Amino acid sequence: MLDALGVIRIEPKAGLDSHAIAGDKIPWSYTWPHVPFGELEVRLKHYLQSEAQEPRYAEMWLRVWQELVPQDVTAYLRHQLRIHQFPDFFLVELARLLMPYDSRYSLGHWRYACWAAVRSMASISLQYPGNVEMLRSTLGSELPRRLRLTQGSLEGKLCFSPSHSLPDCALTSVFCGIATSLGDRYWMSPPSLELF
């Protein structure tokens, strides 16, 4: 998002003026030298609440939304797996499902489906302790089934909003509360250009 707004530039390789955030290892450089780095938060918030909300940025915000949803879904599934003490290797099942479904379902529907699928896994685990293949199969079948159920639900049903679920993401909070006026629509609606 900062790259799209021109605040930073992603560099092809690390250089003297580039930075890398631990964990990401992606080199970047700061491109707003007229704004001291310490004042960036206030200036960026003002920029996001004014110029960045112009219609010309709508497609960029849609791309950001489309990038945030899979990350939020993955973080939420990981969170649910850890609550039930399942290993992260079950996240592989999610990767094959995210692409075909990502434009039809809201993040709240994904969160509901992840929660329900992991609860089903927990039930199967009690009946068949240690049967990893059965758990994998349960997750692989329950996630799409639960997602399909959300399509026929009434507004707000089978949909988890951020106020009732963890983990929380600072970028998501900025995106739906400051940079755009999406608010709860971020959780309740699939990514759509018409919402900007």
Model-derived regions, located:
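Basic, alpha-helical nucleic-acid-binding regions used in initiation and control of genome expression
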Residues: 1-196
